[in-house]
Structures are given as structure tokens and as C-alpha cells.
Amino acid sequence: MATDTGSGRGKGGKGVTLGKGSKGAKASKGGKRIRTKTQQDALKGITKPAIRRLARRGGVKRINGAVYDETRNVLKQFLEQVIRDSVTYTEHAKRRTVTAMDVVYALKRQGRTLYGYS
């Protein structure tokens, strides 16, 4: 009879438990802290290889090192504007959930019509 090694690959199992009366991240002073992502960390999530793949798709052969940070900043500005417009459409419709059509209308407003989401 095999014993469970706790690797998480066996039958059943309870997974990670916090213990009786535990409060998760606030469990005790000596507990492991949960690190929240800062905005800078989130921008670094768009990796150099991902930017390189996008550039290759656009026909770029060589990339200067300064391009990566600039690409992240431009992408951040673009997404902020699209999200801001999408939320405006959502609020005008008195909803709390942003729909795909809100994003389509926001892109259309910026002159970037997206087809296929009607």
C-alpha cells in the first residue's frame, strides 16, 4: 500500500490548509507575507521575449535595448485609455460589468474598429 508523500499528485488530498482558527495572511507574526504586485512589477510581466515576438511579427530584425521599456509604457497608455473609455460606456449603461461590446465601442471611438464581436 502506497503512502501519500504530500506532493499533491496522489488521489484526493486536502491541498493547503491554514489550520484551525487561522486568518490566512494575518495568521501570526512569523508567517509568510503575501507580496502584492506593484504597478512596476505588472509592467515587467510583459517580458522581453514577448515584446521581441511582437516585433518579429511586425518584421523587425534587431531591437535596441531601450525599446522594451518604451514599448511597455506605450502599451500601458493605450490600455489605460481603452479601459477608461470602456468603463465610461459601462457606467452610462448603469452596469457594473464591462462587456466585450464596451471594449469594441471604446476601440471604435479611438479609430481602431474591431470586427467579429457583434
UniProtKB/Swiss-Prot annotation:
Give the InterPro entries listed for this entry: CENP-T/H4_C, Histone-fold, Histone_H4
Residue segments, region Disordered: 1-39
Quaternary state and partners of this protein? The nucleosome is a histone octamer containing two molecules each of H2A, H2B, H3 and H4 assembled in one H3-H4 heterotetramer and two H2A-H2B heterodimers. The octamer wraps approximately 147 bp of DNA.
Q: What does this protein do?
A: Core component of nucleosome. Nucleosomes wrap and compact DNA into chromatin, limiting DNA accessibility to the cellular machineries which require DNA as a template. Histones thereby play a central role in transcription regulation, DNA repair, DNA replication and chromosomal stability. DNA accessibility is regulated via a complex set of post-translational modifications of histones, also called histone code, and nucleosome remodeling.
Q: Which domain of life is it from?
A: Eukaryota
Enumerate composition-biased segments (Gly residues). Answer: 7-22
What are the recorded Gene Ontology BP terms?
Answer: nucleosome assembly
Please identify the protein, giving its name as recorded: Histone H4
Q: What is its main location?
A: nucleus
> Which GO cellular component does the record give, naming just one?
nucleosome
Instruction: Provide the GO MF annotations for this entry.
Output: DNA binding; protein heterodimerization activity; structural constituent of chromatin
Please state which protein family the record places this protein in.
Belongs to the histone H4 family.
Q: State the compartments where it is located.
A: Nucleus; Chromosome
Arranged from A to Z, the UniProt key words for this protein are: Chromosome, DNA-binding, Nucleosome core, Nucleus
The answer to whether UniProt assigns keyword Oxidoreductase to this entry is no
Q: Has the keyword Endoplasmic reticulum been applied to this entry?
A: no
